[in-house]
UniProtKB/Swiss-Prot annotation:
Alphabetical keyword list: DNA damage, DNA repair
Signal peptide residue numbers: none
Protein name per its UniProtKB record: DNA mismatch repair protein MutL
Record HAMAP family: DNA_mis_repair
Organism: Aliivibrio salmonicida (strain LFI1238) (Vibrio salmonicida (strain LFI1238))
Described function: This protein is involved in the repair of mismatches in DNA. It is required for dam-dependent methyl-directed DNA mismatch repair. May act as a 'molecular matchmaker', a protein that promotes the formation of a stable complex between two or more DNA-binding proteins in an ATP-dependent manner without itself being part of a final effector complex.
Gene transcribed to yield this protein: mutL
Length: 652
């Protein structure tokens, strides 16, 4: 068969194999075009799961009449013109393949009008050469695209479509992702003439929270922690669930890079690592995360469906995401068990369950016995309440409350948080207690008898990543091993290599109180060892187990490393484990000596630190040691006196 140029329709149908996988793929491409056109309202009409009709209507800028023909041509786009544009993409679409590919496997009609035009025009491509025909139409400013009879001319593709319900479910899930990425756009979805979803544009914080609840459910918002971290051109923000809000499946996991929805392996791995110590193997995190990065530092043209990206500094991005997730979870875990609200005054009667039938007001000071008696009455009343969930005991209901985001649209049933709030009213507070390290708004607690007519504002905690700094803010890295810190008006240098030692020592030192968690290696490591050491391995098992190190004897001269603790997981185990066993064999050390020895092995004299690594290291030190960190200040920190430098500036 001779080499020949393929007909336009056949070439487009081949391209459609990557672009148009199913009806949801069509919706994705067309809605993204609407977003790129600046639309603030997008209406989607679906019939029979998208196989019969997909109609996308927007109020964007529209397409001029003279460009309609080009719009249905392959590799025709208004979004890029040069290679520099391709390397700094800010739009969702850029290849110019979608409309041509879709029109080759369906009956597509494109109707559009710009502000400058008095009338709209409709374009339709058909025939072997995909010739475009134009005709006038009635249409407001914006664009409407009708995709009828998808895959009508490719029976092999059509028979692989699932049921209408399944295909529509994919479309619904897709629009959830888009609705989260652009909270400022109104999105309406109809199926077979019935309204299914209405996502209204969210401008205020309350509206944003309502959209989050509409997409992810109120249970997600109940356990949501708001995170935000910024470093140079890299910004990370969004919402993550606390461990208490973990799910049985990964159905609420949404991630975006520069507004583009992603299913990237590097990002997912960083998030999993951040949650590693917080969730069990059968639990899944829930999150809505946004990563904003300089377009020059990310390549989005690496996947047919644009679901994956390639970061120019992949390690930096990975560690940055891990640091934000891990830091937020650790700080949230250390917060007091106080319910938060975002300056919303909620009706007292709707916020707390009715208690007037079994709690009497008292003007006397509340003693411990009195509080215990009131708590007992509360439990008994709960047990007698028909609406109380049978799946939770009264002890659990009353005593447990986790930091969350209570909202007005939660279930009408009382929650653990609500009952705990009531119990908080019965607890007196020491006025001289100044140990809290977070800001709280003024709290006014009305008398129980006034509850029906009063409102209550409970303490408002800052975001989970906002914490009081013990060392200070990392400004930059000097000579690759020293971090420049600012704490108030004071500048300091921190030795990052010594900080690495302190971190490792702190992590390993917890072996005095509990067995360190052993993390299995993906591929068990076989290492050679002296016969004498191997024969005495059973004598060392106590210390090794306490440190989370799991070794199996293979034969008289080799071992298999099955698992190690997290602090040494990233080390060269091929060298570290034999050296550790040799050290134990030679001097028979105590657990404290082994911990000190291991901590020094983790310290790298030739290490080079980036700013992101320095920020992460400082944050981990603050979380690990807290106020006890001051004991290392002599070796860890050196003050910088900038007084002379300031005085040297003479402007007389």
């Amino acid at each position: 068969m001779p080499i020949q140029i393929l007909p336009a329709r056949l070439a487009n149908q081949i391209a459609a194999g990557e672009v148009v996988e199913r009806p949801a793929s069509v919706v994705k491409e067309l809605v993204e075009n609407s977003i790129d056109a600046g639309a603030t309202r997008i209406d989607i009409d679906i019939e029979k799961g998208g196989s019969k009709l997909i109609r996308i209507r927007d109020n964007g800028s529209g397409i001029p009449k003279e460009e309609l023909t080009l719009a249905l041509s392959r590799h025709a786009t208004s979004k890029i013109t040069t290679l520099d544009d391709l390397e700094a993409i800010v739009s969702l679409g850029f290849r110019g393949e979608a409309l041509a590919s879709i029109s080759s496997v369906s009956r597509l009609t494109l109707t559009s009008r710009t502000v400058a035009q008095e009338e709209a025009w409709s374009a339709h491509a058909e025939g072997r050469d995909m010739e475009v025909k134009l005709k006038p139409a009635a249409h407001p400013v914006g664009t409407t695209i009708d995709v009828v009879d998808l895959f009508f001319n490719t029976p092999a593709r059509r028979k692989f479509l699932r049921t209408d319900k399944t295909e529509f479910t994919h479309i619904d899930e897709l629009l959830k992702r888009i609705a989260l990425s652009r909270l400022d756009i109104t999105i309406n979805l109809r199926h077979n003439g019935k309204s299914v979803r209405q996502y209204r544009a969210a401008q205020t914080k309350m509206q944003v929270e309502k959209r989050l609840a509409a997409v992810c459910g109120a249970s997600f918002l109940q356990h949501a922690l708001e995170v935000e971290l910024e470093h140079g051109d890299l910004i990370f923000h969004g919402w993550i669930s606390s461990p208490e809000g973990a799910r049985a499946q990964g159905d609420v996991q949404y991630c975006y890079v520069n507004g583009r929805m992603m299913k990237d392996k590097l990002i997912n791995h960083a998030i999993r690592q951040g949650y590693e110590s917080s969730l069990s193997t059968n639990q899944y995190a829930a999150y809505i995360l946004f990563i904003e990065i300089n377009p020059h530092d990310v390549d989005v043209n690496v996947h047919p469906a644009k679901h994956e990206v390639r970061f120019h500094q992949a390690r930096l991005v990975h560690d940055f995401i891990y640091q934000a997730i891990y830091g937020a979870l650790q700080q949230a875990a250390s917060l007091p068990e106080v319910t938060t609200t975002s300056d919303i005054e909620m009706d007292r009667e709707s916020y707390f369950p009715p208690m007037k039938d079994y709690v009497r007001q008292s003007s006397l000071p509340l003693t411990d016995a009195h509080i215990e008696n009131k708590s007992k009455q509360l439990k008994e009343a709960i047990e007698a309440t028909p609406s109380y969930p049978n799946k939770a005991s009264s002890d659990e209901w009353v005593s447990k409350a986790k930091p969350s985001m209570p909202k007005a649209y939660q279930s009408e049933k009382p929650s653990q948080r609500e009952l705990n709030n009531y119990q908080h009213l019965l607890t007196t507070r020491d006025r001289e207690d100044k140990t809290s390290n977070f800001e709280v708004n003024e709290v006014r607690i009305p008398k129980i008898s006034e509850a029906k007519h009063n409102t209550v504002v409970v303490p408002q905690l800052k975001s989970a990543v906002s914490t009081s700094m013990l060392l200070g803010k990392v400004l930059s890295v000097v000579d690759k091993v020293f971090g420049l810190l600012q704490l108030g008006n004071q500048l300091q240098l921190v030795d990052l290599r010594y900080a690495e030692f302190i971190k490792s020592y702190g992590q390993l030192n917890s072996a005095h109180h509990e067995v360190l968690k052993a993390q299995p290696l993906l591929i068990p490591l076989s290492i050679g060892i002296d016969k004498d050491i191997c024969n005495k391995l059973t004598e060392y098992q106590g210390i090794l187990k306490q440190l989370g190190i799991d070794l199996k004897v293979k034969n008289n001269e080799s071992l298999i490393v099955m698992a190690v603790c997290q602090p040494i997981r990233q080390q060269n185990l091929q060298q570290l484990i034999p050296n550790l066993l040799r050290y134990i064999y030679q001097i028979n050390p105590s657990l404290d000596q082994v911990i000190s020895w291991l901590s020094h092995q983790v310290q790298h004299d030739e290490a080079c630190y980036s700013s992101a690594q320095a920020i992460q290291l400082v944050m981990e030190l603050e979380q690990l040691w807290g106020n006890e960190l001051s004991q290392f200040n002599n070796k860890l920190l050196k003050n910088i006196d900038i007084t002379q430098a300031i005085q040297a500036f003479s402007h007389e």
